[in-house]
Amino acid sequence: MSTTKAQIESAIKTALDYPSYMTLMQELVHKGMSTGLEQSDALTNYTLLNNKRMKRLNKTLSVSAQVQARIQNYPKDIRFLVLTESWCGDAAQSLPMVSKIAACQPNWSVSL
């Protein structure tokens, strides 16, 4: 099955920005839930762990001045459309850096 332009446009319209996703993660932790239809203790625990990891990485990661300069000179607009769930460990490790990279260029954004 291939993804159509209409599906991508729909996903972009309903997507969250990164700060909103972090707020959602916090709300899910508070409610003892995870994203998605399936709810389990394991997924709830992964959500809790990922929220902690992402908060830590948001505080400790940085983009070097050299990389920032290269990003700021990149002429094209970019939107990172990320498909994820709150319990996904890979996203917890990568989204904080993707967000920091996108923040270096006003014409770049992250949607989840």
Predicted regions and their residues:
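Thiol-based oxidoreductase modules, predominantly thioredoxin-like and allied folds used
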Residues: 80-84, 98, 106-112
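Conserved redox-active cysteine motifs that mediate thiol-disulfide chemistry
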Residues: 86-93
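Non-globular targeting/processing and membrane-anchoring segments
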Residues: 1-78, 100-104
